[in-house]
From Swiss-Prot:
This is ATP synthase epsilon chain. F-type ATPases have 2 components, CF(1) - the catalytic core - and CF(0) - the membrane proton channel. CF(1) has five subunits: alpha(3), beta(3), gamma(1), delta(1), epsilon(1). CF(0) has three main subunits: a, b and c. It is a peripheral membrane protein. Produces ATP from ADP in the presence of a proton gradient across the membrane. The gene is atpC. GO terms for cellular component: plasma membrane; proton-transporting ATP synthase complex. Belongs to the ATPase epsilon chain family. SUPFAM superfamilies: Epsilon subunit of F1F0-ATP synthase N-terminal domain. Signal peptide: none annotated. It comes from Persephonella marina (strain DSM 14350 / EX-H1).
Length: 136
């Protein structure tokens, strides 16, 4: 068991002793157990699963951020984290359509705008998939 904190700009989403944390990183899905080697890496949108002995796993949808695995503690710092059942499917569909429409006009966009709409599209697609909506 080890202490885990999941933090967003709005505050602490989860804080407690856990057995395992499973999260998507830029290098793929990783599982963190007690005494994991030190690690600092980027988190990508997807599912965060927190396993606590004798409880059902807690699952969250998370967006971009970082995970900091220290010898005695794990901190997940992400832009957003919320229960999968809390995903606003209609809102995410609208954001996906908006991003796709803007990206079709990419000649008129700056590189920064293109990157922002790509992130918006990726985020919406992943959150919709986590909510059980087929988008691809």
């Amino acid at each position: 068991m080890y202490p885990l904190e999941v933090v967003t700009p709005e505050g602490i989403v989860f804080k407690g002793e856990v057995e395992q944390t499973v999260i998507n990183t830029a290098d793929g899905e990783i599982g963190i157990l007690e005494n994991h080697m030190l690690l600092l890496t980027n988190v990508v949108p997807g599912k965060l699963r927190i396993e606590i002995p004798e409880e059902e796993p807690k699952e969250y949808a998370v967006t971009h951020g970082v995970i900091d695995v220290r010898g005695d503690k794990v901190i997940v710092l992400v832009e957003e984290a919320f229960g999968i059942s809390e995903i606003d499917v209609e809102r995410e569909k609208r954001l996906l359509e908006e991003a796709k429409a803007k990206l079709e006009e990419r000649e008129t966009l700056s590189l920064e705008e293109i990157e922002n709409y790509e992130r918006m599209k990726e985020r919406a697609e992943i959150l919709l998939e986590l909510a059980g909506v087929k988008v691809r």
